[in-house]
Amino acid sequence: MNTERSAAGGSRRRALLILAGAALLVLALLVGVVVSLSSMFSADEPSSTYQGPPAATGPGADGGGAGGGNGPEAEAALAHAPMLEVPGQAALPHTLSTRSAGPPITLPQPEQASGVLVPTGFPDTEQGAIAQAVELTRVGFTGADPQVWAQAYDSMAEPGAAPAAQTPASQDLVAFRRAANMPRTGPTRATVTWTPTSALVKGSTDDGSYVVTCVLGELVTDYKGRVATGGLGNCLPMRRVGDQWLVASGPRAWVAPATWPGSDEAVSVGYRDIIR
């Protein structure tokens, strides 16, 4: 088994268990489900698919952007560059930072929003790549349903991109539903939504045709007005193909740190507010 991401996956897995535990507690309080939340916060379970990092010293280790060349090797280096590790509790709501990772990122509007599953038609800029990743994640995270993610992802993936089921986002949703005692796919008693708040560019190739971007938002579980919320991020390798940004062929991107938007941890990763 690959071990390239085990440490990052372990931290993120703890964050997902905490978020799912909060969601499950909301459901338990309302429908009388008898659960033991303590089991969710016990010793780390080994990740079955995440790969664990080398020392975080490469591009993206401090949350900053990076570049260097073009072609498959340069793209793989950007995708695989480690991200800052954060504790699982960093995903829960807590005090906002007085610091900033930089000015807000203004996102463009899509040229096509009707008749498509995921809005598309963003300009050939880094902001366009971020905006496309935001829309894909927003649609794909609806209901925290791995099947919905697969449909949205497949509609925007270049041939040769990592299969949807092998992406960290899909694994996150599977883990969240399992920990929250929800069915693997399909409707649930709760409404689960993801609202984008922040983003960063981890790096791009010199020609700008390949961009690794990470987006962060609030994952909200609502059951009849009772709400559990937390931060959940998603990193995607994006490639400019014709007049569109698509999820790039080649390796998947490093796991996005799960942080509460606007917190010190989010700022340290490099997340900046997004505006439209």
Task: Tell me the role of every PLM-derived stretch.
Residues 2, 6-8, 64-66:
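Intrinsically disordered, low-complexity regions enriched in glycine and serine
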Residues 3-6, 146-242, 252, 259-265, ...:
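Structured, amphipathic secondary-structure segments that form assembly/contact surfaces
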Residues 5-44:
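Hydrophobic single-pass membrane-targeting/anchoring helices
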Residues 32-131:
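Juxtamembrane and targeting peptides
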Residues 72, 90-111, 231-262:
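Short beta-strand edge/turn micro-motifs at domain boundaries
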Residues 100-178:
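Core segments of small alpha/beta cavity-forming domains
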